Design a protein with these regions (language model features):
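Domain-level detector of nuclease and nuclease-like folds
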Residues: 48-246
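Compositionally biased, low-structure terminal segments
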Residues: 10-12, 235
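N-terminal module-boundary/linker segments of secreted carbohydrate-active enzymes
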Residues: 24-51
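N-terminal signal peptide c-region/cleavage motif recognized by signal peptidases
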Residues: 18-20
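Bacterial N-terminal signal peptides that target proteins for export
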Residues: 1-10
């Protein structure tokens, strides 16, 4: 290969790589995950947990998504002691430091995250929140705001209208696109689990942009944050929307 051919080849490769980088940037990149649980399904296999033993058909989490967590990608336990990390991994959440929140945020979190009855907020902060640049107040404030936005969308309406019935991936993607813009459904992954002989939908994980990691996200548009995330495979293709109760 002559020097001229080599330069031409090198230039062509660089342009291809640059084009790929631009395309990736245009598609967005997931920096945070919003994990939203369908609590009745979670409780089918965790019936002894306080939040499950106390669940009723009238409670908020029976017909709305619950906040599992807000997770920075590929980071966990930032600046956490080995003892606290070990306690967290052993499920000894009651031994972890209390999460100091304002009365308003604490009340909002108790509604959005029924797992607070088992110390879930302590686990989420130790494992995930410590890897954000937010205060504990802002971290949970953002999480509550985002799951509230999900619960005022066509996605929640779809689930609430189909309790006890099977919902397919295509319908869920369409609901995301309806509420959060074209392509939003391509940034969602669905998880299912077995409850006896029935496959129930247990959780949705939603890809978000880096802007989800700022205190300003407490007033951000969930549609904008999803739009800035990267595409993913949907996972479970269908499942039953479980009703409260065992």
């Amino acid at each position: 290969m002559s020097s001229m051919q080599l330069r031409t080849f090198t230039f062509a490769v660089s342009m291809i790589l640059a084009g790929a980088a631009v395309a990736q940037e245009a598609e967005g990149r997931t920096r945070f995950i919003l994990a939203a649980s369908w609590q009745p399904a979670f409780c089918q296999t965790n019936q002894k947990k306080p939040e499950c033993a106390s669940q009723t058909g009238e409670r908020h989490d029976a017909t709305n998504f619950s906040l599992h967590g807000l997770w920075p990608m590929r980071q966990d336990y930032c600046g956490v002691s080995d003892d606290q990390k070990a306690a967290d991994k052993d499920g000894k959440w009651d031994t972890l430091p209390d999460v100091a929140l304002s009365a308003e945020t604490k009340a909002s979190l108790a509604k959005a995250m029924p797992g607070t009855q088992s110390g879930l907020e302590r686990h989420e902060w130790i494992k995930h929140g410590t890897c954000t640049k937010m205060s504990v107040e802002d971290y949970f404030g953002v999480g509550v705001h985002l799951v509230d936005a999900l619960n005022t969308s066509a996605v929640r309406d779809l689930f609430a209208a189909n309790i006890g019935k099977t919902v397919k991936a295509e319908a869920i993607k369409a609901a995301f696109d309806k509420s959060f813009g074209p392509g939003a459904g391509e940034r969602v992954k669905m998880s299912c689990r077995r409850a006896g002989s029935v496959r129930v939908i247990s959780e949705l994980t939603i890809g978000l942009s880096a802007d989800a990691g700022a205190a300003s996200a407490k007033s951000a548009s969930l549609a904008d944050l999803i739009r800035g995330g990267g595409k993913t495979s949907f996972g479970c293709d269908e499942g039953v929307v479980d009703a409260a109760g065992f």
